[in-house]
Amino acid sequence: MFKINIITAFPEVFPGSLDVSILAKARQKKIWDLNTVDLKKCTSQIHSIDDKPFGGGPGMVIRADVLQNAYEKAKIFFKDYNFENVEKIMLTPNGEEFNHSTAEVLAKKKGLLIICGRYEGIDERFIEYNNLRKISIGKYVLCGGETAASVISEAVLRLLPDVLGNEKSRLEESFVNDMLEYPHYTKPRVWNNLLVPEVLLSGNHKEIRKWRSEKALYFTKKIMKKNKKNDS
């Protein structure tokens, strides 16, 4: 069973979208499981998990001692596992950018221990002491790491064996082999005077594969060009 444990100041956020559709069914089948550790219950001072930053500046910083209490508590969820095979992730805007390749690597682990940041950030000593892997889900800032934790968890969970109903769909989707996926069409054949491409109705599977490959390449180049322009 693949296990995910999330350290957060807002455990009520979870499971959220992780408990619907195919992921809910996979959890019922015990393919994976989820636990949360409430930071507010890991401090000796009532609901006090943060303090002012040394050196001044805006916002509040989550305390290292509170985080470590939560971290030790989170380890218990993995007591039957080799903890070395659990990826320990700190969600932060200054981490490596998460992508499909990262998800594939994480899916080969035994589980994930995810720490959600909040406020101005967390005490850097906690990250260094536990040798955490810093990960970001994009070049923007959120109010906290809870949304990012759900994004990473979902991307990883759907790669686990037997989670998707059709394993072939996983091999043909976007970002596999660094390619975006081809466009899809279904009934009706005509909608608002827009037609389904004839090749998809032809029954010629060789031509269909060729068309899909060409479209995937076209969209990949188009988006890469746009992303490159946005980064410049």
Describe each region flagged by the PLM.
Residues 21-25, 104-108, 129-130:
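Short, solvent-exposed amphipathic alpha-helical segments in soluble enzyme
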Residues 61-118:
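S-adenosyl-L-methionine/SAH cofactor-binding core of RNA-modifying enzymes
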